[in-house]
A protein has these predicted regions:
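Conserved RNA-binding domains used in RNP assembly and mRNA/RNA metabolism
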Residues: 1-95
C-alpha cells in the first residue's frame, strides 16, 4: 500500500471532489481509470475507498484517498491509485 500521498488537500472543494470520485467506485465495480498522466488502468475495485487524514514530512495535515484496483488481466496484481490521479472513471460492470 502507498504510505504517504504526494498531495494533501484541505480546501472543502478539493475534498468534495475526492468524495465525488469515491461514489463512482463501489465495491467490486469493474472500471477503467483514466489517469491524469494519460495512462489507463482496468480492473476491479476491491473495496470502496474513503477519504483519510494524512500528515506530510513537515507535519502538515490534509486529506486524500487511495483505491485498490485488482488488475483485469492479472488479478493477482493490485494497483493502489491516489484519487487525485484519476481524471475519469469508466464503468464496465460489476464482478
Amino acid at each position: 500500500m502507498i504510505e504517504v500521498p504526494q498531495h494533501l488537500y484541505t480546501r472543502q472543494a478539493d475534498i468534495l471532489h475526492l468524495e465525488t470520485l469515491i461514489q463512482e467506485l463501489p465495491d467490486e465495480a469493474q472500471v477503467e481509470l483514466h489517469l491524469t498522466d494519460g495512462s489507463r488502468i482496468t480492473g476491479t475495485v476491491s473495496i470502496r475507498p474513503s477519504v483519510q487524514v494524512f500528515r506530510d514530512s513537515e507535519g502538515a495535515q490534509g486529506f486524500n484517498a487511495a483505491v485498490r484496483i485488482d488488475d483485469q488481466q492479472h488479478p493477482e496484481h493490485a494497483h493502489y491509485i491516489w484519487m487525485d490521479r484519476i481524471a475519469q472513471v469508466v464503468h464496465l460492470g460489476s464482478a
